[in-house]
Amino acid sequence: MRAIISLLLISAMVFSIIEAVPEEEGLQLSEDERGGCLPHNRFCNALSDPRCCSGLRCKELSIWDSRCLG
């Protein structure tokens, strides 16, 4: 009987925590997660997403440094 009551209390607490977070907040994604583009002078990788914004290209400045430049 105690186990059932404890389980019900834990379920109620978890549900109240989930309801406390607004739905819109949980759906907001960062620019990178949405597959957006990278602005000027940001680190990039020409072989993987996200890509540089239109008008910019991922230019290799050295072996370890590539940036979105115009």
Swiss-Prot record:
Modified residues annotated as Leucine amide in this record: L69
Propeptide segments, given as residue ranges: 21-34
S-S bridge residues: C37-C53, C44-C58, C52-C68
Expression sites by tissue: Expressed by the venom gland.
Signal found in the keyword field: yes
SUPFAM superfamilies found in the cross-reference section: omega toxin-like
Keywords noted in UniProt: Amidation, Disulfide bond, Knottin, Neurotoxin, Secreted, Signal, Toxin
Similarity annotation: Belongs to the neurotoxin 01 (U2-agtx) family.
Domain writeup: The presence of a 'disulfide through disulfide knot' structurally defines this protein as a knottin.
Protein name: U2-agatoxin-Ao1l
Protein source organism: Agelena orientalis (Funnel-web spider)
